[in-house]
Amino acid sequence: MRPELALVPGEPAGIGPELCVRLVQQPREDCRLLAFADPDTLRAAAAALNLPLQLLPEDAEARVPGDLRVRAVPNAVPSHFGHADPANAGAVIGALLGAGQACLSGELHGVVTGPVHKAVINEGGIAYSGTTELLADQAGVKVVMMLANHIVRVALATTHLPLRDVADAITAPGLEHTLRTVHAALRREFGLAAPRIAVLGLNPHAGEDGHLGREELDLVIPLLQRLRAEGMDLVGPLPADTAFLPAKLAGFDTVLAMYHDQGLPVLKYSGFEQAVNLTLGLPYPRVAVDHGTALDLAGRGIADPSSLQAATTLCAQLARQRTLSA
């Protein structure tokens, strides 16, 4: 199976469009890409890079370097690299929702997304907290954020919260949903028959038997015991300061961190260029780059396409595996 994937560049004034141009310089055998984007922005990116780009109709086939099928989502005003315009917020959101709807309808099999500038979207009058939340709301599901590179996968029990709010946000129902979502995704999309998940403690030393916090004793341990009784292979709660040692990581398929900066610094240190962001729990695979819009680099031809390349390759793999698991 050769999955059909939506490719969404993200912020038109950032590096997303030029990364898409670089991506299609090698024809892909693992998937067919359909860009949801402003055609003029893609052409400008190709010109800035001095690379070939042939925008094709949706029913065409990409055969040579630079071929890219496009479903046009025009900007409201012309975009200029390095200068994000809130007037184009509607086009950015429209491209994301269009890609999501194409997957929900069964037309496409997955979505690969470039970086979006949250502040610019909100300045454009659209309440927006992130693409993860946008696509989850569209699909009517609760999702889990996972980041991954070639060394480790890290799922998050909470995402973008102030540290003072994290403990209150971790509840037994919420943590159970997260673990079930991660477990199901590892089976369905990664093809792991019996995934092993390491669960980090919230507190230093995983609470030190209640002396450094009781969340582990009162909430995490009882939940893990109950889910283990159902057959889930869960290890923990583990002290976060030693859980990422290579010898320990080798025994886990995924690590569940309780908050953003507990799990992600190690992942990004171990391979930021190859890191990608996955949304687990959607009816289709969505994989995003793990970097921002980099307005200061846009149009200069120096942005690294590694994360977008990794995201596209992984999304194609997940889409194929999901079909096999159906």
Curated annotation (Swiss-Prot):
Record keyword Magnesium present: yes
A Gene Ontology biological process term:
pyridoxal phosphate biosynthetic process
TM annotation in the entry: none
Q: Which Gene3D superfamilies did the record assign?
A: Isopropylmalate Dehydrogenase (3.40.718.10)
Looking at its record, which EC class is this enzyme?
Answer: oxidoreductase
Places the protein is found: Cytoplasm
Please provide an example of a Pfam family that matches this protein in its UniProt record: PdxA
Q: Which cofactor does it need?
A: Zn(2+); Mg(2+); Co(2+)
Cofactor binding remark = Binds 1 divalent metal cation per subunit. Can use ions such as Zn(2+), Mg(2+) or Co(2+).
Biological or metabolic pathway of the protein:
Cofactor biosynthesis; pyridoxine 5'-phosphate biosynthesis; pyridoxine 5'-phosphate from D-erythrose 4-phosphate: step 4/5
Query: Which positions in this protein are listed as binding substrate?
Result: T132, K268, N277, R286
Entry keywords, A to Z:
Cobalt, Cytoplasm, Magnesium, Metal-binding, NAD, NADP, Oxidoreductase, Pyridoxine biosynthesis, Zinc
| EC number(s) reported in the record | 1.1.1.262
Q: Which residues bind a divalent metal cation?
A: H160, H205, H260
Q: Which GO terms describe its molecular function?
A: 4-hydroxythreonine-4-phosphate dehydrogenase activity; cobalt ion binding; magnesium ion binding; NAD binding; zinc ion binding
The UniProt entry lists the main location of this chain as cytoplasm
Q: What quaternary arrangement does the UniProt entry report?
A: Homodimer.
NCBIfam families in alphabetical order: pdxA (TIGR00557)
User: What function does this protein fulfil?
Assistant: Catalyzes the NAD(P)-dependent oxidation of 4-(phosphooxy)-L-threonine (HTP) into 2-amino-3-oxo-4-(phosphooxy)butyric acid which spontaneously decarboxylates to form 3-amino-2-oxopropyl phosphate (AHAP).
* Protein family: Belongs to the PdxA family.
Protein name per UniProt: 4-hydroxythreonine-4-phosphate dehydrogenase
Which organism does this record belong to?
Answer: Stenotrophomonas maltophilia (strain R551-3)
Which taxonomic lineage does the organism of this UniProt entry have? Bacteria, Pseudomonadati, Pseudomonadota, Gammaproteobacteria, Lysobacterales
